Regions:
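C-terminal cap of thioredoxin/glutaredoxin-like
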Residues: 21-47, 51-108, 229-303
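A short beta-strand-turn-helix
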Residues: 125-142, 166
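A short, surface-exposed interaction/processing loop segment used at functional sites
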Residues: 101-133
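Bacterial N-terminal signal peptides
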Residues: 4-16
Length: 303
């Protein structure tokens, strides 16, 4: 679904298609945020301008709506970064485009790190900021960090491949960081429960995550507390204590810090993996051999 909507977004913007009537999704205020390499000197377009631009691009497609999630300076000096949530019958996708300093051109694509060691900035940020449950040797030459959302179908689909990758790689340490997406109505609650389970028992955490993904389609916003409490109990911790912990301000602070860490390294969707700082943003279970190659290459580079 992520790749489908992203492809539609790129094709429509790149093709310059325009104009018919639709009703955009209700807009959220722009949320400027600092991150590594951000240039605060960029001239930011207004939400009204961005909305008009999107209306001209997508207005003819009645089943496609959008919500402006953020407008802020990009990592590249002079470029403004616009984050938009696109919604269609296929689902929702968080995506970005960039506005040139002249305010008359937009760039569609991904800004990637460049340099002799392009992945070191993200690697260093993650090494300092990761707090999630982990598996594998502490001194492993490779650290794989997953930013995940327990309500995310793509995360559920990716888990068997990620599990196999971690199990087969003695060179890898694996860390899970909560990154609940606003578009999912019980994801934040799931992250709070997961945070509490992880602090209570590292072993129970992995059982909790596995069972939550397994029963994901049975959980709703209305039943989340009941279901997640039972899953926590089944994972080997006291469900009632976890439910109480999930409501504590400290827990929300932990989850918010994990989200902030993800945003600092440019996480925009889930699952997103980092292999020693190298971003793998579109996880495809069919590419297991490629991911193994990335881990092995990172291990050699770390020597």
């Amino acid at each position: 679904m992520r790749s489908y909507l992203k492809s539609i977004f790129i094709l429509l913007l790149a093709g310059g298609l325009a104009a018919a009537q639709t009703t955009p999704a209700e807009q959220a205020p722009a949320k400027p945020a600092a991150k590594l390499g951000t240039h605060a000197t960029a001239d930011l377009p207004s939400e009204a301008t961005v909305d008009s631009f999107l209306h001209q691009q997508f207005g003819y497609q009645a089943d496609l709506t959008w919500k402006i999630s953020g407008i802020r300076p990009s990592p590249v000096e002079g470029l403004a970064e616009v984050t938009v949530v696109l919604a269609s019958p296929q689902g929702q996708q968080l995506t970005k485009f960039y506005v040139a300093p002249d305010g008359k051109h937009a760039l569609v694509g991904e800004i990637i790190p460049f340099g002799a060691k392009p992945f070191d900035p993200a690697k260093n940020l993650l090494e300092k900021g990761i707090t999630g449950p982990e598996r594998g040797p502490k001194n492993a030459p490779v650290t794989i960090v997953e930013f995940g959302d327990l309500q995310c179908p793509a995360c559920k689909a990716a888990q068997p491949t990620i599990e196999a990758l971690v199990a087969a790689e003695p060179n890898a340490r694996f860390v899970f960081q909560n990154f609940p997406l606003e578009m999912h109505n019980w994801a934040a609650k799931g992250a709070a429960y997961a945070d509490c389970v992880g602090r209570a028992s590292n072993d129970a955490f992995w059982k909790f995550v596995s069972k939550t993904y397994e029963t994901q389609s049975d959980i709703t916003a209305e039943t989340a507390d009941e279901k997640l409490t039972a899953i926590a109990e089944g994972a080997g911790v006291k469900g009632a204590e976890i439910a109480a912990c999930a409501l504590e301000p400290e827990t929300k602070a932990h989850v918010d810090a994990s989200i902030a860490l993800g945003k600092s390294v440019d996480v925009t969707g889930t699952p997103t993996l980092y292999i020693n700082g190298r971003k793998v943003g579109s996880f495809d279970p069919r590419m297991t051999d490629v991911y193994k190659g990335l881990v092995e290459f990172a291990a050699k580079q770390a020597k």
